[in-house]
Amino acid sequence: MSAAVLLSVLFALACGQAASFCIPTEYTMYVDRRECAYCLTINTTICAGYCMTRDINGKLFLPKYALSQDVCTYRDFIYRTVEIPGCPHHVTPYFSFPVAVSCKCGKCNTDNSDCIHEAVRTNYCTKPQSFYLGGFSV
């Protein structure tokens, strides 16, 4: 293998490791309220991807804030509100959710993100579905 090819491969690997791939990603979620007749399928965007992290040796000697890792999180987002069809009059039929506009690698903000790794939850409807298409329910 020539030196130029070897150098270009090493350069590509180094750039791939240093770059963060944290971008808005399409995501489908299902809103299922017990009291309402329908489940609402919502297409939105969330922040997902890879952020560069390091595991520090000598963790015993560092303060806790120095041990936190960067995560892929919201830089800018907006909230959208939809109406879940088939809800009785005594139930509030509105559901608000964040839509990622741009993302960044940074500390997790508990004001707008779930920062705890949970077990995988089922993400499906248990009732007939109604779809939300960006401005109105169908």
From Swiss-Prot:
CC per GO annotation:
cytoplasm; extracellular region
Mostly located where? secreted
Q: Which GO terms describe its molecular function?
A: hormone activity
Residues that carry a glycan: N43
Where does the record place it? Secreted
Cystine crosslinks: C22-C72, C36-C87, C39-C125, C47-C103, C51-C105, C108-C115
A Pfam family annotated for this UniProt entry: Cys_knot
Keywords, comma-separated and alphabetical: Disulfide bond, Glycoprotein, Hormone, Secreted, Signal
The entry's propeptide annotation covers 133-138
The signal peptide, as residue positions, is: 1-20
Does the UniProt entry include the keyword rRNA-binding?
Answer: no
**Subunit comment for this entry?**
Heterodimer of a common alpha chain and a unique beta chain which confers biological specificity to thyrotropin, lutropin, follitropin and gonadotropin.
Say what the protein does.
Indispensable for the control of thyroid structure and metabolism.
Regarding protein family, the annotation reads: Belongs to the glycoprotein hormones subunit beta family.
This protein is called what?
Answer: Thyrotropin subunit beta
Q: What is the lineage of its organism?
A: Eukaryota, Metazoa, Chordata, Craniata, Vertebrata
